[in-house]
Amino acid sequence: MKANRPIRKPAIGSILVMGLILLALFALWLFAASFIYTVTLGPDLPISASQFAHDVLTTQQGWTMIAVGMGVGFLFALVVLIISVVSFPLLLDRNVGVYRAIATSVRAVRENPGPMAAWGLIIAAGLVAGAIPLLVGLAIALPILGHATWHLYRRVVG
């Protein structure tokens, strides 16, 4: 059975490249978040976590930061979902390169926008639920989401 074999050596390089792409997107997201913070609340850091919470929740600038930050974060999450929803399973399952894996993922999302949007919401809900108990729940949520992603990939790509 293909799912039980160890990672093929040719796939390791492609998986590494895909990971680096996602790492670059993460770095861009951090830069965007820092920029949004600076533009809305100013360049100075708060003196405490409670001061930060007060500034964010009780000022117009704080609510602007929340709204803009959530919108930008949603766009980053959407890009990550689109390029990676079937990329990693495809790289593990077949001998394809990163470009083809990303193109296949984009095509899968384009051809199945409703189910893929639902899957994105399920992933988000699973991660939130796993994070609530001091991140310990992620030890349960991540393997379940990974297994379900494999089945989604098999159903969508075949």
Language model region names:
Residues 1-158:
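Hydrophobic alpha-helical membrane segments
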